[in-house]
């Protein structure tokens, strides 16, 4: 406990939200410099809370949370809960101790737990399977409000198998209805009660949700294998039917997930039955597949050859897997270009709004707030990072023209915020230098930088892709057309390894 608790406190995010008591991680940070005699009482308190050996009122205080409504898309709302720092600290410490056990429990096809670059890894897995089995039809399933409707008992029971101590600790808070304080105004609030669902903002939330979704994902995987075996005339192998990995059939089936973002792949002749099976399996687990927001796509299967239920959700240009475009690399990258165009357009609107925040007194949050400093922080740490995710996963040649537009937007917004009209070449360079080197911290997405981001991401996710698909990602130009194509089959890695 001591080692993981110390690590949890040492790596706690500075400036994160306070609990209802007003406590923050910074108030506990001096314990990192405390002697063993001063640290021991804190460690004993943490151990008592972890084991449930504390008065009921302590558990009730730690179960409370402050709710915040975040914007989700154009009209949706994402509820976020901020718990007491002590609970968050202890939760992270317990997860450090069992994260490998949880990852082994949910398996390599759940990319949200224990996998660095989980979304890119899942997208690359889909891309590689699509090129290996070109007749596969891929479904991207949308589960309606999945996080907030997940059965708590199912999730805790599944977690119990992998991490009983963590499950026992979390049951103190998820075993009874949760209450959250939500402010309606400066002097007004309401209490929100939740009986099901995983709390977004809980450090254990992703692991707990992934455990809750494990059973339906496993059931769906088994059902699809059985479907293909029976269709191809194979007898079901009862001993191996529940194992992870590819199906032992002429064509592979796959079920991948990043939390509730679920990808299903089957040979085209089983597409309709697979879609119906997915709807049925998730319904038994309390989840609803939204047909209108789901999609399907294939490299070689034509839309006209699929049944009406699949034609209605057909995506001609590819799928967005975790927001990452997956498409036919031999055709025009329409999906990737549209996504990058959307990113640049949204960033331009947000940058314009930041400039308005500085110049329009009616938009001021408070008379005393430092508008220039605040908007520069948002520009540098939020907007300027929005291209990196896609630069790591899309062919640099596709990204480059959009990166030029993106950098121009960032630079123009910065100059308007600090009220500077023109800069020379030397000053332009200084804008892109890191703060620690005397620059302004506006990252420049040059061709070399885009290539570096792309290659480093591919190398990072390669082990996860191999674990999920059995396919290798080799950074060598000899395999550029084979199974190391990453997200652009004709892309050569050899010159980039020297960067």
Question: Which sequence ranges carry the predicted segments?
Answer:
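Conserved pre-catalytic core of RNA-dependent polymerases
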Residues: 1-216, 226, 452
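Short acidic, Pro/Gly- and aromatic-enriched capping/linker segments at domain boundaries
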Residues: 2-13, 306-317, 419-436
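Inter-domain linker/hinge segments that demarcate the starts of reverse transcriptase
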Residues: 39-52, 122-130, 271-286, 340-353
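Short amphipathic alpha-helical coiled-coil/interface segments
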Residues: 46, 402-414
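A conserved non-catalytic segment of reverse transcriptases
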Residues: 178, 183-184, 194-196, 256-258, ...
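Extended C-terminal regions of large enzymes
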Residues: 418, 422-499
């Amino acid at each position: 406990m001591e080692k993981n608790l110390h690590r949890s406190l040492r790596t706690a995010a500075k400036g994160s939200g306070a609990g209802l008591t007003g406590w923050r991680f910074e108030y506990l940070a001096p314990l990192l410099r405390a002697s063993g005699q001063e640290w021991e009482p804190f460690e004993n308190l943490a151990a008592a809370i972890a084991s449930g050996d504390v008065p009921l009122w302590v558990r009730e205080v730690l179960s409370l949370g402050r709710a915040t409504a975040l914007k989700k898309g154009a009209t949706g709302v994402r509820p976020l809960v901020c718990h007491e720092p002590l609970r968050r600290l202890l939760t992270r410490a317990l997860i450090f101790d069992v994260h490998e056990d949880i990852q082994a429990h949910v398996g390599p096809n759940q990319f949200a737990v224990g996998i660095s670059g989980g979304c890119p890894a899942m997208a690359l897995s889909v891309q590689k399977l699509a090129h290996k089995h070109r007749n596969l039809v891929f479904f991207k399933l949308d589960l309606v409000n999945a996080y907030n409707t997940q059965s708590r008992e199912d999730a805790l029971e599944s977690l119990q198998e992998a991490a009983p101590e963590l499950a026992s600790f979390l049951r103190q808070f998820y075993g009874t209805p949760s209450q959250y304080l939500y402010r309606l105004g400066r002097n007004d609030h309401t209490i929100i009660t939740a009986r099901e669902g995983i709390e977004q903002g809980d450090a254990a939330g992703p692991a707990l949700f992934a455990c809750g979704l494990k059973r339906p994902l496993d059931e769906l995987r088994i059902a699809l294998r059985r479907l293909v075996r029976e269709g191809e005339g194979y007898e079901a192998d009862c001993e191996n039917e529940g194992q992870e990995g590819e199906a032992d059939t002429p064509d592979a089936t796959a079920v991948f997930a990043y939390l509730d973002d679920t990808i299903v792949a089957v040979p085209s002749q089983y597409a309709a039955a697979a879609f119906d099976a997915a709807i049925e399996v998730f319904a038994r687990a309390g989840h609803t597949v939204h047909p209108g927001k789901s999609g399907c796509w294939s490299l070689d299967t034509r839309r006209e050859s699929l049944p009406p239920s699949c034609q209605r959700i057909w995506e001609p240009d590819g799928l967005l897997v975790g927001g990452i475009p997956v498409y036919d690399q031999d055709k025009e990258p329409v999906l990737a270009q549209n996504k990058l165009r959307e990113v640049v357009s949204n960033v331009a609107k947000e940058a314009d709004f930041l400039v308005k925040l500085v110049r329009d007194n009616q938009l001021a949050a408070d008379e005393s707030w430092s508008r220039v400093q605040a908007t520069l922080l948002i520009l540098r740490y939020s907007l300027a990072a929005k291209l990196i995710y896609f630069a790591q996963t899309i062919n640099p040649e596709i990204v480059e023209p959009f990166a030029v537009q993106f950098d121009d937007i960032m630079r123009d917004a910065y100059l308007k915020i600090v009220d500077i009209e023109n800069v020379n070449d030397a000053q332009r360079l200084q804008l892109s230098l890191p703060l620690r080197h005397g620059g302004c911290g506006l990252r420049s997405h040059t061709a070399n930088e885009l290539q570096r981001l792309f290659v480093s991401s591919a190398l990072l996710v390669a082990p996860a892709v191999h674990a999920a698909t059995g396919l290798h990602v080799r950074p060598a130009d000899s395999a550029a057309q084979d199974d190391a194509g990453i997200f652009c089959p004709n892309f050569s890695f050899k010159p980039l390894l020297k960067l």
